[in-house]
Amino acid sequence: MAEKQKRLEEKIGKVPEIFKELEKTDPDLYGKVMGLDQMIWADGALSKQTKKIIAIAIAAALRDGHAVRAQMAGAGELGVKKEEIEEGLRVAFLLAGMPAYVCGKAALEEILGDRPRR
């Protein structure tokens, strides 16, 4: 597995099939996408943790359960608190409605429900 894919697997728990395929079929685009991924998730004006909360809220607003779960797993690895994710989901609810909140809330309980509060 390429070094970039190892880092991705460490961040989100697995390498999405699309990345494996892209590396084979279009290595140039793959390199650019992975570079963009590293740049976006790096600490900057916003912390990685804050970016994960934003990503969870966006995925919930899109009602993409797979993306919500993947981002939540990454958030858990970064030490994001359940209460912080809950606040992000409330923003999604305000802007995208109840279905977005329900999507995110279900994943929150599944992924981080039994996790002790910090």
Q: Can you say where each PLM-predicted feature lies in the sequence?
A:
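Amphipathic alpha-helical segments within well-ordered protein domains
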Residues: D37-Q38, A55, M72-G76, L89-R90, ...
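Non-catalytic, well-ordered alpha-helical scaffold segments
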Residues: P16, K51-A55, E86
